Amino acid sequence: MKHNYYILFLILISSLFLSNKVVESYGHRNNNKGGDSKILLKDVQVLTLRSGEMTKARRSSPIQQMECIGGTATKELELYPKTIQCYNMGSNGVDVQWKCEATLDSTVRLGTIDVSCEGYSYPEDPYITADSCGVFYQLEYTNEQRRKAALAEEETSWVQIIFCIAFIGLILYAVFNWCGSPQGDDDSNTAQNNTATDNNYPGGFPGNNNNNNNNNNNSNNNNYGGNYQGYPNLNNNNNAGGCAQPNNGGGGGGGWFQPGLWTGLASGYLFGRIHSNRNHHHYYNPSPSYNRPRSSYSSGSSGGSGISSSSSSYSGTSRR
């Protein structure tokens, strides 16, 4: 008798376990039903897209239903729309055309948009995967001065980056040209300069150089050689430092380090920074206008005007 109860208990536990699995499998199928069903694109009349939610997908990866991909107001995260609705406006003979609307702060508006849907079997399939459409949009300022300011800031940042890279590259090139050049030429130039110095150093009376060449050379070598601590050893070919010494008379690699070149580059860099900052402040601090509310654009940073307005933009359909 006890054995029969034990068998019944095992059957009951197994039934509960299997029923739980069936319920989970049914719920899983329902959750992915949108990814398995197809619909004719031209029959879709309205798309309601929400921020932070993902699309369904069958062949590719899901995408965000709404994604900002640029525009002059792309940094204004708090002004992003929460919902966008797109309405089927008919076909242009190639694909469905959409009008997308969103409720936004009056300081921004929708720019260029792109409605993207997943083709059911292939990208250009007339049928799409249900709930697979998303919208990529740009967010623009409605105020012309702020729009120009954002464009100028972006352009200035790129110019500064390019200038800094070029400036650093020029410095590195000059350093490698200075320190990495072979020292054989410098040594030969130094030897020639030493010979000229020994022959022409004022050690006697004018007119006696031809007759007393040997005496002058011996005298110069004895009196101005490396043994005299007050005068550098011109015949020493081993430089104290790791870089080749500058050749003031030969016009060699040392020309890179002439003060005029680096002073000019530094001055140009500082002038460019000052000029760009001045333009930046000029754009972001426009003179007050009595034709618009003071609360809309009182400063360069934007927290929005607090006034909502409807914004719309038009798009075709891209496939993935």
Curated annotation (Swiss-Prot):
It is a single-pass type I membrane protein. Residues 1-25 form the signal peptide. InterPro entries: SARAF. The keyword Chaperone does not apply. GO terms for cellular component: endoplasmic reticulum membrane. The keyword Transmembrane applies. GO terms for biological process: calcium ion transport; regulation of store-operated calcium entry. Negative regulator of store-operated Ca(2+) entry (SOCE) involved in protecting cells from Ca(2+) overfilling. Belongs to the SARAF family. This is Store-operated calcium entry-associated regulatory factor.
